């Protein structure tokens, strides 16, 4: 597999290099040089296969001979040990539930596959994973890499801006997992990560690698659950399928669009955001004007400068698709609350991120179409806000109940690269 840097098309790397490097020169994102496509008959055959077999085939279409298919299937099996069920909400709308993994969020798919791939390609070379999280990435990455030989993980997160339960999920592990609460917002955390990757001396000394959705292995893994969703739908739903994706950094939407590019039958996508609406405003006006990040109920989507957007634009350019065909909506906190109550009345308990995707879908779904929205995190991960909004108690899943009792092991730093650099260089080997 060959990939090129979106900021410098002359920089081309292998799949292994892209996983290990994370970003290219000038913090450019890597993008596949070849975009595979399946024939209609191949798609039908894929949709009949089990999740692991199908996913191995999809990933192999991108990765090629760099990872032999038998080794790849073993890695996929180790990564995707949990289901991604489609739950019926109404006659014409279902939810793809991506929260049945160890940290109860969709990021388990990408995080675990990346850990497996890094173990496959890195061999004995020690690696330091440095990533920023607005919630779910941190837990998924921490659990995926916890205890792995030759890997240190450093996770930055905005202090006081993620739910207490989310924090407990990844800040209580210790060992090779180092968590740092930054005095700033998520964009400040991302900026620090980018500065670290721009520091060649630091990068070389620590063999730095990024584990957020800018890493190509995570993105490829996410393609697989879109196929899994369609495989569970009846034929009539497949022909008129609209998918609504709750969007923050836009990795999930990029993966869905790559699935469509492979030949998955999706009529259209909707990018659903909260008040951090840089993309919906851009799609309406043609002006890219990020505002200051606003704190919302759907905190994992509190991103005003989405990292993956250049990949979306590149895919549309390569496929000669029109950006105006991409549905979009920005949903306020008040509407999010109302939608969660509406879903509860339908018998479906949701959380703010999925509720935003449902709202955008419900408002834009046309007669004869079938809607699918992504449930990216278990409602109990947002226990306090969900209980307050719905006025009912949520039982804690076992994974969360166990972590809730443990002490936090985080360090606290100001949003200063100098301080972060000092911390990184002082980490135990």
From Swiss-Prot:
Residues bearing PTM N6-(pyridoxal phosphate)lysine: 107
The UniProt record lists the EC number as 4.2.3.1
A GO biological process of this protein is: threonine biosynthetic process
Extract the Pfam families matched here: PALP (PF00291), Thr_synth_N (PF14821)
Described function:
Catalyzes the gamma-elimination of phosphate from L-phosphohomoserine and the beta-addition of water to produce L-threonine.
Q: What sort of enzyme, by top EC class, is this? A: lyase
Supply the source organism's classification. Bacteria, Pseudomonadati, Pseudomonadota, Gammaproteobacteria, Enterobacterales
Name the domain of life.
Answer: Bacteria
Q: What is this protein called?
A: Threonine synthase
Keywords in alphabetical order = Amino-acid biosynthesis, Lyase, Pyridoxal phosphate, Threonine biosynthesis
GO MF entries: pyridoxal phosphate binding; threonine synthase activity
Matching InterPro entries = Ser/Thr_deHydtase_PyrdxlP-BS, Thr_synth_N, Thr_synth_N_sf, Thr_synthase-like, Threonine_Synthase, TrpB-like_PALP, TrpB-like_PALP_sf
Q: Which family does it belong to?
A: Belongs to the threonine synthase family.
Pathway-wise, it operates in:
Amino-acid biosynthesis; L-threonine biosynthesis; L-threonine from L-aspartate: step 5/5
The secretion signal range is none
- Cofactor(s) demanded: pyridoxal 5'-phosphate
Q: What is the organism field in this record? A: Serratia marcescens
Catalytic reactions of this protein: O-phospho-L-homoserine + H2O = L-threonine + phosphate
